[in-house]
Amino acid sequence: MDTQKIEAAVKMIIEAVGEDANREGLQETPARVARMYQEIFSGLGQTAEEHLSKSFEIIDDNMVVEKDIFFHTMCEHHFLPFYGRAHIAYIPDGRVAGLSKLARTVEVYSKKPQIQERLNIEVADALMDYLGAKGAFVIIEAEHMCMSMRGVRKPGTATLTTVARGLFETDKDLRDQAYRLMGL
């Protein structure tokens, strides 16, 4: 990540909106924003393979559900945050991931400029590709600051997106069970 370019760009934005980039409260802002971007975009170029490849053998194939995984990310359209909760269900095929690995999977894909629909897809596909799940079902509910603080200005509006892979695509009863276990 080119922090010098980020700092220069932020300084130009400060000046472009009519502020003095050299006043006390803004002098360090370009450097702070560059450090923040290093942190919140740390998922760029990464996948969840390293997290989901560390799995444990299991003899049954009962559904695993982890819900209310908090995340925050940046909308790629306005570079404003959106945040919320991810709910994950999957059917193992002989192996299960450690529970923290599901949260880490959400984190990896949320640490980059993102849209909610793609975040859903990337998490579900990672469970299928790297864990070898028989099925994956991901629901994300989020509030988007681009809707809350600008434009339509409707704070508190939740957007829900879902994606189903494998067994969840074809088995409505399985999806319904996942919804119930997720409390949705």
Swiss-Prot record:
Pfam families documented for this protein: GTP_cyclohydroI
EC code(s) of this entry: 3.5.4.16
Single GO MF annotation: GTP cyclohydrolase I activity
One GO term (biological process): tetrahydrofolate biosynthetic process
Class of this enzyme: hydrolase
Keyword Metal-binding: yes
Binding site for Zn(2+): C75, H78, C146
Superkingdom, taxonomy of origin: Bacteria
Keywords: GTP-binding, Hydrolase, Metal-binding, Nucleotide-binding, One-carbon metabolism, Zinc
Pathway participation: Cofactor biosynthesis; 7,8-dihydroneopterin triphosphate biosynthesis; 7,8-dihydroneopterin triphosphate from GTP: step 1/1
Record field: catalytic activity: GTP + H2O = 7,8-dihydroneopterin 3'-triphosphate + formate + H(+)
This protein's record includes keyword Metal-binding: yes
InterPro entries membership: GTP-CH-I_C/QueF, GTP-CH-I_N, GTP_CycHdrlase_I, GTP_CycHdrlase_I_CS, GTP_CycHdrlase_I_dom
Gene Ontology cellular component list: cytoplasm
Subunit text: Toroid-shaped homodecamer, composed of two pentamers of five dimers.
Family: Belongs to the GTP cyclohydrolase I family.
HAMAP family assigned: FolE (MF_00223)
Protein's name in the database: GTP cyclohydrolase 1
Source organism of the structure: Streptococcus pneumoniae (strain ATCC BAA-255 / R6)
Primary gene name: folE
